[in-house]
Amino acid sequence: IYYLMDVSSEESILKVSNELAKKNIRIDVLINNAAINPKASSLKDNIRTTRLENFSTERWDSELAVGLTGSFLCSKVFGGLMAKDDKGGIILNIASDLSVIAPDQRIYEQKNLERKLQPVKPVTYSVIKSGLIGLTKYLATYWPDKGIRSNDLSPGGVYNNQDEEFVQNLSNLIPLGRMAKIDEYKGAIQFLCSDSSSYMNGQNIVMDGGRSIW
């Protein structure tokens, strides 16, 4: 079963929660993973809009509305429902290795372009992912008496047919020498969303092939 909703709209989220209530469906696990995250290839086409000097407040607002405000609203609504019946629950926020390290803008560089024209990872990505860490810690200490735990998973880059030069640049920064395979985070998600992690609360699990230790 699935429902479409706008995570940046509390009204939309409440509508879905009401539909679930009508069907006596309880949310036991909430995974916040919505984001506006441009692919590396698209950064090259949006140089003038991704660089900090040209980054618009409209884009800032729209990306934070989805990636950070959306996680707050979903946690507020669905976490609040979990807390009502004392059956506990789990909130998992999907952050990023860029929640603990700065983006290395060199991996996006293009030859024969002066610095002010080089594509970069947008500022919003780091701000949102770092913000999720703070949100998780807040939630972890807000409902513990209700049996609700909150943690983060911070994945590194996932290989998905990106530009070869980008893949090599990023892989050079990772001790394992490669990007993650698309299914390599399943085990961590299952762990964090199960009783196997019953004593874990307010933590950030970084799975980045070792990138953040260099």
Cite the ranges covered by each PLM segment.
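The beta1-alpha1 cofactor-binding region of Rossmann-like NAD(H)/NADP(H)-dependent oxidoreductases
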Residues: 4-15, 57, 182-184
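Short C-terminal tail/terminal secondary-structure segment
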Residues: 49, 113, 190, 201-214
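A conserved structural motif in NAD(P)-dependent oxidoreductases
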Residues: 174-185, 196
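Conserved NAD(P)H cofactor-binding loop of Rossmann-fold oxidoreductase domains
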Residues: 33-48, 210
